[in-house]
UniProtKB/Swiss-Prot annotation:
Signal sequence extent: 1-28
GO MF assignments: electron transfer activity; heme binding; iron ion binding
Assigned protein family: Belongs to the cytochrome f family.
Name the record gives this protein: Cytochrome f
Length: 342
């Protein structure tokens, strides 16, 4: 069943997955989700949605059933318009980045390289492979991430992950045969909110109060405290060539809105203009978005499959014998009818 979550409904104070990092070469990191004890909440929402506020499709492909130890390919398609560029950390256009969060059933692992299909090997050579989200917790090695990468380097905008199912018949097995869920979240572009709730330069900026725009300054330098993942310390980041809008309310109190480079001021935002609380000051520069999908996969018992095949074969033989017997009876009846001159 397809589930895509609109992050705004869940607030803006959670840690981000895939949000901007200071270096231009590190535009977004799904690894920020590691700050959560559970990156996939009980509601089914993956925490990446907390900071990627736009909804975009994510498509996954897995087989309906698999056998123990039989490697299969998990395919994750992250579609986007290749003509569009995202807003970089300095406000300039930058290549669209894509990344993914993958939660396999417990016991399912990434296959060894010698077991990869040719298609999976070619894909991994392009995007670099998966990384455990909780590197310090081997028991949670089924939760993986694909860190942000330039989407133009990923053929077909598709990640392929070779997965090996466990064998419940193994001596130390902790899993059973049955149905399990595979959960995937994928984003394209940077997030709109940092871990501490501060908006990034891919967010739309609104007026915090109603009043009169008393000043509009361009080319402004200012500093914001940005937190790059839950549990990390917020650090100062200096924006240059930003915009500062001052709004004075009816009591004469001034509110200042510092806008980093990236969002563009609307034509209506001019000195002396009247504005309402919540009214947009800028356009929405975000061209990316996040989506998540889940699929059921059945870990089949080979013995059960064998018995099923045997049962179907026996049923087929029985039906065949019945057909042959019926034809035999019909021939006997036809012969007796001819003998009696009927």
């Amino acid at each position: 069943m397809k589930k895509q979550w609109i992050a705004g409904a869940f607030g803006l104070t959670a840690a981000l997955a895939g949000l901007v990092s200071v270096p231009q070469s590190a535009l977004a990191w799904p690894s920020f989700a590691a700050g959560y004890e559970e990156a996939r909440e009980s509601s089914g929402k993956i925490v990446c949605a907390n900071c990627h506020l736009a909804v975009k499709p994510t498509e996954i492909e897995v087989p309906q059933s698999v056998l123990p130890g039989k490697v299969f390919d998990l395919k994750i398609h992250v579609p986007y318009d290749t003509k569009i560029q995202q807003v970089g950390a300095d406000g300039s256009p930058a290549p669209m980045q894509i990344g993914a969060y993958i939660q396999l059933p417990e016991g399912f692992t990434v296959a060894d390289e010698k077991e990869w299909s040719a298609e999976a090997k070619e894909s991994i050579e392009k995007y670099g492979g998966v990384t455990p989200l909780y590197a310090d917790k081997p028991e949670r090695s089924n939760i993986l991430i694909i860190n942000q990468i330039d989407g133009s380097t990923v053929p077909g905008q598709e990640f392929i992950v070779p997965v090996k199912p466990p064998d419940p018949n193994a001596k130390d097995a902790k899993v059973n045969f049955g149905k399990y869920g595979v959960y995937v979240g994928a984003n394209r572009g940077r997030g709109q909110v940092y871990s501490n709730g501060v908006a990034s330069n891919t967010a739309q900026y609104n007026a915090p109060v109603a009043g009169t725009i008393s000043a509009v300054q361009t080319g402004v330098t200012f500093t914001d405290k940005l937190q790059y993942g839950l549990g990390t310390e917020a650090t100062d980041f200096e924006y240059t060539n930003g915009t500062r809008v001052t709004i004075t309310d009816e009591k004469g109190k001034a509110s200042i809105v510092n806008i980093p480079p990236g969002p563009k001021l609307l034509d209506t935002v001019k000195q002396g203009a009247q504005i309402k609380a919540g009214q947009p000051l800028t356009n929405d520069p975000n061209v990316g978005g996040y989506g998540q999908e889940e699929r059921d996969i059945v870990l089949q018992d080979p013995q059960r499959v064998t018995w099923l095949v045997a049962f179907l074969a026996a049923a087929f033989i029985c039906q065949l014998l019945l057909v042959l017997k019926k034809k035999q009876v019909e021939k006997v009846q036809e012969f007796e009818a001819q003998k009696q001159g009927l």
